[in-house]
Amino acid sequence: MVVAYLRVSTNKQHLENQQEEIKKFAAHRGLDIDKWYHDVVSGKVHSNDRKLGDLLESLQEGDCLIVTEVSRLSRTLIDIMNIINTCIQRKIVLHSTKEGYTFENNLN
């Protein structure tokens, strides 16, 4: 399953730019987005208290999570690192489109 996660901090910000960025990224890689999740909440709110927490719990080995930037996951480095580690440990591929990062368990 391929899942996209969008987050903005305020209603004045727009999710559309993130959505378009992810659509282009997915199309370029031949991926079809199965589900879209979005939050309108500060990145300082812990991931378990946002839709992101439910999303992370629902992902299974082999799934793919796409965000535009790792800062969409959280505003604290520790939370970002924990989320990335969780994905790697559970063999979930995490893509960050703007930064060009792909986090996956491929070092073995």
Model-identified regions with their sequence ranges:
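Short, structured surface patches at the beginning of a domain
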Residues: 1-108
